[in-house]
Amino acid sequence: MVCTVAVGGASAAPGAAGGAAAAGGTAAKPLPAELEKIRAREADRLYGDPAERPLGERKTSLISLGDSEISGEGVGTYEPGTDGPDNWCHRSPDAAIHRTGIGADVTYNAACSGAGSGNIVIGGSKQYADELVQSDSLAIAARNTRLKMVLLVAGANDDLQFGPVMTDCVTRWFLFQGTCEPKYQPGWQARVDGLVPKVERTVGDLRTVMRDAGYADGDYRLVVMSYPSPIGPDVEDNPRYPGKLPGGCTGYTSDAGWGRNAAVPAFENGVRKAARDSGATYLDASRLFHGHEVCMEDTWARGLYVNLTNPFPPNSNSVRQSFHPNARGHGAFASCLTQLYASGLREAACADPASTGQPKLYPEAWDDAYRPLKNTGTGSCVDATGGASRNGTVVGGWDCHGQRNQGWWYDPEQRSLHVELTQDRCLDVPGGRYAAGAGLVLWNCSGTDNQRFVRADGGTIRPAAAPSLCLTLAGAKEPLRLQGCDGSAGQRFA
């Protein structure tokens, strides 16, 4: 079953029945009889008759495939027949695919909560009796409409088993069993390495489905999107922090840090590799929810949620909505996808640059954006002390080691310096005190003047509001301070 939402467009004139040619003139291969019956029935709903039309005479469409991250799990409103008891796909009418600004007459959401690559690939298995293998849903949509974008979000339910790991981490917190990082970190990269070929195969199979439907590879966009982190360790910086139980950010704070700083970045690297190696367009959403995690301001993810009435009596399905994008999160996905489609980029990243709630697209993956700031005079690197990212964390010098608390990205539009730990913490002059000797800290990115810096010739970095002052490291492990610019090596960074 595929959820279809018509969002406008007039009925096209019928063409010859079966095998209609695509833009490049390639005829579609016939579907198996069972799928052809479904295709004809859906064509009749779309156009008033079951004929398969030439590509140029069809309604335009978008489709999403994958798992709970993109199906709408966590939104809370679900399509009939996908909210139990026999089908838990949890497809939401508020899912991202239905909310983009990409012009399309029809949007399809074939994604299903819990799906692994084996539920998507050609010849794969159905998740539920009333479901199709997702590649079969794509084959039908590709013949009834003119697909403009195919979105795939997959990998979490393969070797990674992200959901069970998350459940175990939360359970260990409730039962005082200790953190889960020591249990999972040693084998995490092996899990990532295992999922990469599965995602690559999935992309390849989707290409095959589209070619069999008569499409050339350039007739549509095939987008692979990575997963954002729903949790983070800085929740107590929220001035309205509700507490872990009321807010649903249950789990050890250090595990939330491991998830944000290690587990999700490794996963993102794997998804990116799969996208690049298979020739898909890649959207890096790994930092999209930074500053919008569970228990933060304007959260874009749902925290721990227990549905006591569906199912009843409660079972494992009662908590399946937990730690998934909420409606605002899907709105953020939709914005990023809209910008990506319009850009024509083959690889891009998306994030909220300054706590605006408005995602922005950048023409690179985040892996390539962050670099150390090495001081010419001391040879040490600018470092967020102790690997922390709480508001007020002191920034200073330390031996260069390549970890994420020494990675920095300069946003030329905002003129802000973001630490790699989180897109939501920027270098900050506390209180806008522009004076010699003033120390610098991390603070929630806001786009205000005390977070704006100018990278000048010669490697100096100066507050935009006080260009006579320079960031200075007086010693290899001294705090980073403002001092009058004097041209010394301690004020130059490479």
For the regions a language model picked out, list residue spans one by one.
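Serine-esterase "nucleophile elbow" of acetyl-processing enzymes
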Residues: 40-113, 170-171
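Structural recognition of the beta-strand scaffold that forms the well-ordered cores
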Residues: 61-73, 106-111, 148-153, 158-160, ...
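Catalytic-core regions of hydrolytic enzymes
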Residues: 118-146
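Histidine-centered active-site loop/cap adjacent to the catalytic His
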Residues: 307-358
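Extracellular glycan-recognition/adhesion modules and their associated mucin-like linkers
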Residues: 361-389, 407-434, 450-477, 492-494
